[in-house]
Swiss-Prot record:
Organism: Streptococcus pneumoniae (strain ATCC 700669 / Spain 23F-1)
Homology family: Belongs to the ribose 5-phosphate isomerase family.
Pathway given in the UniProt record: Carbohydrate degradation; pentose phosphate pathway; D-ribose 5-phosphate from D-ribulose 5-phosphate (non-oxidative stage): step 1/1
Lineage: Bacteria, Bacillati, Bacillota, Bacilli, Lactobacillales
UniProt xrefs under Pfam families: Rib_5-P_isom_A
Protein name: Ribose-5-phosphate isomerase A
Keywords of the record: Isomerase
Role of this protein: Catalyzes the reversible conversion of ribose-5-phosphate to ribulose 5-phosphate.
């Protein structure tokens, strides 16, 4: 599995050219993309500026001497490469298993090209088997939790080391065990209207390309948006 992730990450790095502003994703597959960018800077003299999607990726990039700017210091991002936890046939996805969904969506939005790197196990017919992360402000989080409970969404606060997990933006995450999401676009809109919700892990029709590593090698699928 790790080898598949590495293949996808290295393939994605081919889309990065000199002079670009590059969004560095977060997660186990995006990790290999960041490593490959670091190698190209060191060995090939690749010249880019990068923006990161989490404190974890920032630390990795700094260790590789990748030049960084904050998202507010750039007007746009040429290409962002990130992982995904699930991807359906309509190019909708669930992200946020690593807890970085808010920053990931903030960086993805001004990106001219948005690419996901996944192994074939992440491809699904319908989203929902992977718990859907919802980032909520700490104030009133229990109110939001109870609202989700009443709706039958089987919520649970994400924890780390026996404490509630706190994101880089100092918010909590409520994971929803939905099993299947019949209409990701409508459900995303519903969550957008819940007071106290900062962001959710549904990335609907945002991605341009999905790079999939599997037993038959690396395949690249392009969405309608990316054509």
């Amino acid at each position: 599995m790790e080898n598949l992730k590495k293949m996808a990450g290295i393939k994605a790095a081919e889309f990065v050219k000199d002079g670009m502003v590059v969004g560095l994703g977060t997660g186990s597959t995006a990790y290999y993309f960041v490593e490959e960018i670091g190698r190209r800077i060191k060995e090939e003299g690749l010249q880019i500026i990068a923006v990161t999607t989490s404190s974890v990726t920032t630390k990795q990039a700094e260790g590789l001497n990748i030049p960084l700017k904050s998202i507010d210091q750039v007007d746009f991002v040429d290409v962002t490469v990130d992982g995904a936890d699930e991807v359906d046939s309509q190019f909708n996805g669930i992200k946020g298993g690593g807890g970085a969904l808010l920053m990931e969506k903030v960086v993805a939005t001004p990106s001219k090209e948005y690419i996901w790197v996944v192994d074939e196990s992440k491809l699904v017919e319908k989203l929902g088997a992977f718990k859907l992360p919802v980032e909520v402000v700490q104030y009133g989080a229990e109110q939001v939790f109870r609202r989700f409970e009443r709706a039958g969404y089987k919520p649970s606060f994400r924890e780390k080391d026996g404490q509630r997990f706190v994101t880089d933006m100092q918010n909590f995450i409520i994971d929803l065990a939905l099993d299947v999401i019949e209409n990701p676009i409508a459900f995303g809109q519903e969550l957008d209207h819940v007071v106290g919700v900062v962001e959710h892990g549904l990335f609907n029709q945002m991605v341009d390309k999905v790079i999939v590593a599997g037993r038959d090698g690396v395949q690249i699928s392009t969405s309608k948006k990316g054509k």
